[in-house]
Amino acid sequence: MKIIPLSLLFLLLICSNWGFSQVNPEFDGSRAFSHIEKQVLFGPRSITHPNSKNLTHDYIVNNLKRYTDKVTSQEFTAYGLSGRNIWATFPGEKSPDIRLMIGAHWDTRPQSELDENKANLKTPTSGANDGGSGVAVLLELARALTFDKSPTTVDLVFFDLEDLGNIDDLPFAIGASEFVKKNSFYRPNKGVIIDMVCDENLLIPKELYSKKYSRQLLEEIWSIGEELNVNIFSDKDGTFIQDDHLPFIRSGLNVVNLIHYPFPDYWHTTRDTIDKCDKESLSQIGNVILTLIYKQDKT
């Protein structure tokens, strides 16, 4: 009989455990928070502030390129406006043909029409929560995905020109609509749009377009929330919301919208600032999405 040294036995046990159980990478809410800080520092990411938008665009692209070489910036023109959607792909290791899209808008609203101070009505929002938080979550997901390859392909998509709805008769989700038109070949198996997800009192009900057209995916996400014991999901119904998920739903795709509702009282005001954002809320929504990603080869 050959005697195995205790140190070697311990190492073998560790390796054996690693082989039988996969620990998903963890989402870092503090890192996500720092991405919001950076965006706010650039200034409003609205059509009225092209320099801030260019800085933010390059910041997103350069961060993504640290983690994948599959990054594209797609220019488009709609309603006389120019925009850019950013698309990063992380190929799956086991089932690359199965695709999961995670999306968020990266622009901010060019006015604060709900501000209590009438002098601010034409002032662009800072967009820390509405715009900044979704981008922050996607950028931290990109980092997390490099630690353990996803079993299925993940697409992170940053949509431009989402937040122009009801301004000069413009619709919401212009960039997402253009993305669907330009990439008609793209048919992800599932998709999640996240919006306004950093409030310290984050509460996400079941958005009604999502419930009507993608109920199973919505229930899958709520089940993960229960599994992780997060407190950001409500079993109550929300309302029908115009957001970046709708162009995908209209094209027959299985996409849901995770959004804080009722909207915070600083929504579309100059008070949508970094002090409204919470690292724990970012951690909770981020870890739910990460868990969803790593479960896809089992569903």
What spans do the regions from the language model cover?
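Positively charged n-region of N-terminal signal peptides that target proteins for export
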Residues: 1-7
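A non-catalytic alpha/beta surface segment that caps or lines the substrate-entry region
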Residues: 34-95
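Solvent-exposed loop/turn segments at secondary-structure junctions
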Residues: 46-47, 77-80, 94-95, 106-110, ...
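Acidic/histidine-rich catalytic neighborhood of metal-dependent amide-processing enzymes
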Residues: 122-216, 220, 232, 240-241, ...
